[in-house]
Amino acid sequence: MAQLSLNKDYITVYDGIIEPRLCDNLITFFEKNIDHTFKEETDHRSFQELNLSVIPKYEKAISKLLYPYIDRYKKDNNIIDSVWPPTFRLEQVRFKRYMPNTNDRFDIHADATGKNTSSRFLVMFVYLSDNNSGHTSFPDRDIKVQPKKGRLLMFPPNWCYPHAGEKVTDTPKYILGSYAHYAYLPDEAK
């Protein structure tokens, strides 16, 4: 079972949710499928991305792995049922690679900032590589989460949690990312 290694202000880290060997296999998979990736590059972010929805069996397996940690996050943060979404779903899983000593990074931002992202209520990043740099930082809270194989980082996606993916200087950084979304049922719409 994964170990809780950080739980502060709803920023929660679990270590060991994926075995190191599986992390290595997933990285190999990414590199073998590099022709299915695209380069995301703007003035405030740069990385290589593979959307796992193009390979449904992998996306389903990763989603199945993440679901129990949503419940554990709720429990570990003492979130009561009356304020937690009664139903939710996961956004498509994205696989990202940040190369060292390049412009790859994701400057300070929030992950739910408009109509297209407003149904997100929980961020989930799984680190697949060990890195001495490339931390996910929360400058307002003086928290930095180091990339570590098999580590899961969870936190709210809104403007109260601005964060950044810092530049990598040692080896490529690989992460899987998804979001829990509010899933509106017809009888909930009022």
Please state what every model-predicted region is:
Residues 1-152, 160-190:
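Fe(II)/2-oxoglutarate oxygenase catalytic core
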